[in-house]
């Protein structure tokens, strides 16, 4: 955890960036708009639920994306108070540093499936878990797919640990009957 935090802080200083929540526009349109911004880095970074995606990238790239996405019909484009462009190519220096630390750490075969947001899939293989932990720094968070896969695999109860109930709200938007608590 400390190695990841230090690597990400260093990457934020090396490659300043930010993130913004885009509300009320379909994922494909957000992807399309981000792809046409050529001179700056901006990508969909968090697929939270249908109609709610967070974009991440350079300061100028996110600013341009917010403007274009509002013009394309987004209900809201809200800049987030974050320290960097997480889950984007701007985190590549952190990914390189974290890869070394993870590769030098022994992982055992999982005794239960772990859903990793980089793919949304359940895994138990130490090699796949390691690869996904490394990839998550520069790859999008596929929370929508993660929720869908958990539900398909029989999820019935969700206990949210930590402050707030953000994840419970996202699960409610799936329209699936689940027992939610924190």
List the predicted regions and their residue ranges.
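Alpha/beta catalytic cores of group-transfer enzymes, especially the acyltransferase/condensing modules
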Residues: 1-139
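Acyltransferase/transacylase module recognition
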Residues: 103-182
């Amino acid at each position: 955890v400390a190695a990841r935090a230090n690597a990400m802080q260093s990457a934020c200083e090396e490659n300043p960036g930010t993130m913004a929540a885009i509300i009320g526009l379909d994922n494909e349109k957000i992807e399309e708009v981000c792809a046409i911004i050529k001179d700056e880095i901006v990508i969909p970074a968090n697929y939270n639920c249908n109609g709610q995606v967070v974009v991440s990238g350079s300061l100028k790239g996110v600013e341009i994306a917010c403007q274009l996405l509002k013009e394309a019909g987004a209900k809201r484009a809200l800049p987030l108070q974050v320290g960097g462009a997480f889950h984007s190519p701007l985190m590549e220096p952190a990914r390189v540093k974290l890869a070394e630390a993870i590769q030098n750490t022994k992982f055992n075969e999982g005794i239960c499936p772990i859903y990793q947001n980089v793919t949304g899939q359940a895994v138990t293989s130490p090699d796949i878990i390691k690869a996904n932990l490394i990839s998550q720094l520069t790859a999008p968070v596929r929370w929508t797919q993660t929720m869908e896969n958990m539900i398909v695999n029989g999820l019935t109860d969700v206990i949210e640990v930590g402050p707030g109930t953000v994840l419970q709200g996202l699960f409610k938007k799936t329209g699936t009957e689940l027992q939610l608590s924190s």
